[in-house]
A protein has these predicted regions:
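Membrane-embedded transport module
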Residues: 111-195
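Conserved ATP-binding TGD loop and adjacent catalytic N/P-domain core of P-type ATPases
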Residues: 1-139
Length: 195
């Protein structure tokens, strides 16, 4: 009133609870890129987690889609994490798309996974678990190949009767499944995904 201010409002972005430690943990293992539809007012605050050249502000949904689409041509696999409809195209174009949702019963864009917002801090653990699960799949295949190679060598030599071969064949499958199940449970406990 008459040049005398009685109050003022300061507007700013509010980030999800626990996002700082999540970005720090992910930044230790992966290159992090930020694609935001917002203006660059938060650039300084976000520079603690993202390199200056890895932050892109004012991005439209099409800009995000095009940027994520170019990553495979430069030899990068993108895991896109988004929380809005404006991220839908980029989520679908990425190698792995994870939608962060407050409520899983509402519409979520086409993606590979939906993560409840309250569990966002577990994302680094889920990614470590996924890496371990890939190793378990490879180890299971190697175990199966070794088991069958040994069994085949005995069978070719005539050292196994048809009855023993018939018994060993399902045991091969059972042992590989038991290994995969046990190793997956151990990996889940080790990474903190399962308690």
């Amino acid at each position: 009133v008459d040049g005398d201010y009685r109050c003022f409002f300061r507007l700013g972005n509010v980030y999800r609870q626990g996002i700082g430690p999540v970005l720090e943990a992910l930044g230790e293992r992966y290159r992090l890129l930020l694609l935001s539809g917002d203006n660059d007012r938060e650039r300084e605050k976000l520079s603690a987690f993202f390199a200056v050249d890895d932050m892109r502000f004012g991005q439209s949904p099409t800009d995000k889609l095009e940027f994520v689409g170019t990553l495979p041509t430069s030899g990068h696999n993108a895991l896109m994490v988004g929380d809005g409809l404006n991220d839908a195209g980029a989520l679908q174009a990425s190698a792995v798309g994870i939608a962060v949702s407050e409520n899983t019963s509402v519409f979520s864009p086409a993606c590979d996974g939906i993560l409840q917002a309250e569990h966002l801090q577990r994302l680094p653990r889920f990614l470590r678990f996924a890496t371990g699960a890939n190793r378990i799949v490879v180890a299971s295949m190697v175990l199966s190949l070794l088991y069958n190679a040994v069994g085949l060598s005995f069978a070719v030599q005539g050292a196994l009767s048809p009855l023993v071969s018939a018994i060993l064949m399902p045991l091969s499958s059972i042992s590989v499944m038991a290994f995969a199940t046990g190793a997956t449970r151990l990996a889940a406990r080790y990474t903190g995904v399962e308690r």
